[in-house]
Structure formats: C-alpha cells, structure tokens
Amino acid sequence: MVLIKQIVRFILVILFRVEVEGIENYYLAGKRVMIIANHTSFLDAVLLSIFLPDRITFAINTEIAKKWWVSPFGKIVRLFPMDPVNPLSIKAFIKDLEQDKRAVIFPEGRITVTGTLMKIYDGPGLIALKSGAMILPIRIDGAQYSIFSRLKGIERRQLFPKIKLTLLAPQKIELDDEIAGRDRRAAAGKILKKIMTDMIYSTSNNHLTIMDKLLQARAIHGAGQVVLEDVERQPLNYRKLLLKSSVLSRLMARQTQEKDVVGLLLPNTNATVLSFFALQSIGRVPAMLNYTAGYKGLLSALETAQIKTVYTSKRFIELAKMDDLIALLNEQVNIIYLEDLKQMITGQDKAYGIACSLLPKIIYAQQWHSVQPDDPAVVLFTSGSEGVPKGVVLSHKNILSNMIQLGTKIDFNKNDVILNALPLFHSFGLSTATLVSVLNGMKVNVGKTSEKRIGKSDSGA
C-alpha cells in the first residue's frame, strides 16, 4: 500500500503541481485529531489520504460507502460509514476518535456548488467537543477549478489546475459546563463555523496588488468574461478592459509622475473604471473626488491629498452644469479632459494596448516591480458632514482583505450580475460593488449618476 500511495502521490504532483504547506501542524495536533477541510471536489479525499502521513480514518456517508468506486479507496485509508442523522452513528464515531485516532470529516457534508463554503453543520463541532479531539483545519485550494468539481458553468474549469493544501495550527473546542443540551451543540457548531471561515480568510492570498488580482481573475475566468457595463450598454470583457486601460495609461504616464495622487472627477461610467485601472497600472494613486461636495469640499480634498492633476469629462461637466466650479478648480490644479486624450493616441499606444490585452503578465511585469501590496491603492474622502472632508488612504492589501472577508460570508460567482447604485467615490461603490465584481469575474453595471443632484449640490460653489 505504501508503494501505491507513493506512485499516486508522484502522479498528482506532476499533474496538479500539488503543494503542501504547514505539515508540521499535523504532528503538533497530537494523536487524537479531527481533521476538517473545505469540500471542493471529488479529489479532496484522495488528496488528503495521499499527502497526509499515516493511514487516517475518513468519515463517509453510509450511502456513498456502498458505491463501487469506494472499495479501492478503502485499501489506502480507513473508512468509517456514518449516517449524519443517526445519533448512534455519531456516538460511534466519537468513541472511535477517543481511541486516539486521526479522522477526516467535511463539515459542509457535500461538495460545494458555489465555489465557496456551503452550510456548515453543527454535528462535527459536537463530535470534536465530546471526543476531546484537537481540530486540524486544512484548506484545499485549486481543486474547485478541476473537472472533478461541481462548478460546471459557474467556474472556468481546467484539466490540471494547481492545487495547494494548507494545514493550519490545531485548535480545540472548549465550552463552559453551564451550556447544555441544544445550546451546547449550537455553540460548538458556531465555533466550528468560525474556524472554517477564519481558515478560508487566513489562507487566501491578499499579498497582491490590484493589478495582480486583475490578471489573476483574467487567467481564472478567461479574457472573454464580461465584467463591466454602464448606461451606454457597451459591455467590456477582461480583454477590452486591459486594452483600453493600457492605452489610457500611456497617455496618463506622460502627464503625471510615478506615485502621484491623481484626481478623478467622473461619474459612474466605464471610462471612470478604465481610468482607475489605467492609473493602477502605472503606479499612480487614484483619488476618487466627490463631485457633490461643492467648491470648498473639493478644494479641501485637493489640498489634503496634494493633488496636482484631475481628470474629468467635458460631457459630464456640461450635463452636471459644473462649468463655473471647474473654472475655479482649474486655477488650483491641472484639469485634463478625457475627450482631449483621444486626440493624443498614437499607433504605438494602440500597439501597446493590444500587446497588454494579449500578453498582460509579460508586458506589465516590467512596470509593477515598484508597487507593493502595502502601498496606497486609492484615496477616498469622507462626506464632510461633520466638518472638512478627510482623506482615507486604502492600500492594495486593505481592499483585497475586505474582498476576501466578504467572500467567506457571501456566495458569489461569475454568473452573478451586480448593480452598483452607489457613486464610485463612495467606499462601497468602489470596493464592495465594483472592484469585488471585476476582480472576481462578475459583471457589474455601474449605474447612472444623477446630473440633477450633482448640479444642485455644486450650485453653491
């Protein structure tokens, strides 16, 4: 059996480039251990049985245990058929764990059909509590993109995606003796759910820049995945988004300096999002200006963030009746209209955009070396309702960490369509609605800005 295990391990490493991190935690957990893992695919049990030391026990549904293909698997691991609704079955499993066994159980009870955590049942938490077993959380990542998952039509599945197993520090569920009955079961289940969600968060990679994450999303979901649309009904997929933002970035690079904070005074349109990513790709920091703040509010924001250049739109200024406001701001900063940039595009700019849309990792790698995850990614501003608007600097890591936290609580996938009813200068409008969507393969419609409201708000400039 050892030889078979080694052969299967070799094959899996070659095909799926399997990486195991934190194996020392397996031994730190001791002998009486309940191993819990997220359930991503039919490969999960094979991966755990092959890459974990020893011959471990697998809790398996009694109906699944009757399948013909389960029998060969039982030669590598020890199978423990369980009926999840039968109290006697659970008691038997607890007694088995008390014999200082290491056993694997999937708290979700089934393979995910959303790509994220499914409902986590209380039973495994109660088992860990009553048996006194240490809990060893293991994150399985990558198998959800394989053909062995149940995400057909939800994720872009691959034949041999890279798979990583991460073993976290062992934990133990402990409760006060005063908690009894159903409350005790529920409390144990609640702790287990927290362990699972914390596991997903702590093993997700937030040490990236926004552009790194954009390219990662393109690779996962495909260049043709539509992710952006506005009221003009001209949807953009990853390929077009990278093409247009890359051309725009060349023009902006000639007008600004690296690490400059650059103002965007724009409504909710594709052009605003393209401008945001264009600035990201050349190491500038976008500052999302609140066009309803009036002259004093905007001037304060410009001074606070030390903004020297602001990009806006002639059409937007005209519809919003902000000509007087822009004339005043133009005395303080350099106002550049996106419409004017179109006249500056050269053949080299277009060629660069095409190259970036086809080979983004190769082209962009030369530009991003100076941008780090902890560097500022965007500057937002408070409403000013309690005084002068304050600048809020968010790093790339801040934004991606918030996105990961959201993903542990909400099921979303590339088939979802998000309507962003908030302005892009709003933290939720930019990060929660727009960036979460674009960076996860979902299509976001950035809605429509109310010109009437803008004009009224700025009339006192």
What kind of region is each of these model predictions?
Residues 251-293, 421-423:
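Conserved AMP-binding/adenylate-forming
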Residues 335-381, 388, 411-417:
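Conserved pre-ATP/AMP-binding loop-to-beta segment of ANL
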Residues 10-13, 241-247, 359, 364, ...:
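Conserved structural elements of the adenylate-forming
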Residues 254, 281-354, 461:
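Structural core segment of the AMP-binding/adenylate-forming
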Residues 22, 98, 102, 115-179:
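A cross-family acyltransferase "interaction/gating" segment
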Residues 400-417, 425-461:
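Conserved AMP-binding/adenylation subdomain of ANL enzymes
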Residues 235-239, 368-370, 377-401:
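Conserved AMP-binding A3 loop
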Residues 213-238, 377-380:
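AMP-dependent adenylate-forming
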